[in-house]
Amino acid sequence: MQDNENAVVVYPCSRLSGEIRLQGSKNSVLPIMAAALLKAGVTVLENCPDIADVHAMSGLLKKCGCRVEYNEHVMRIDASAADNGILDDEYSTKMRASILLMGSCLGRFGRFVMPPPGGCAIGKRPIDFHVSAMRQLGADISGNSGGVDAYVGRHGLIGCDIRLPFPSVGATQNCLIAAMGAKGSTRIFNASSEPEVWDLCCYLRMLGAQIEGERTGNIEITPPQVINSEDIHY
């Protein structure tokens, strides 16, 4: 550190004590919020962080027809009447995780349209892995300038083997979410094994999925014949 740079100096004290409440993980809650769109029912998420990305995802879910309520770090999502997979740029351009709605919209509605996703500027962060995976599952996708226009034909999404070029967390999550709307099992090779993937798998199991290998880098998911519509608290 240069002499002219600002610095924070921490001095030791005799004792540290007290209690703090840790905020829930944004990286876990956003994909679970996206996956809640798969379910024609209510999902309640506790210890949900009060941050801009969470509220942006809430706005996107409302655009899809969900009823969303947030009060004192508790998020209630009712996707019973959700009927739309076409998003505008009011919220989707504000955060990267908007792309996670591709899997749930294709799985439930068979249609997904979104302008280029936004988010923090951390170098180049293309959505190629997401698009390639959805195509392998059977979606027809076009787009320009980073946006996406996707639909599923009359045969629907079909479970398959997907090998990711890189263990992308977001692409892994999108594969898992989309696989819930596919016929048959899906295997994801070179998948991410980060904790936020584990959390998503826990939620998808509550919807009725059978999942193996989420901590190994190779995941197999078999969707239920009918997604659980009972209220879920997570």
Predicted ranges, named:
Residues 1-234:
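Structural preference for solvent-exposed beta-strand-turn elements
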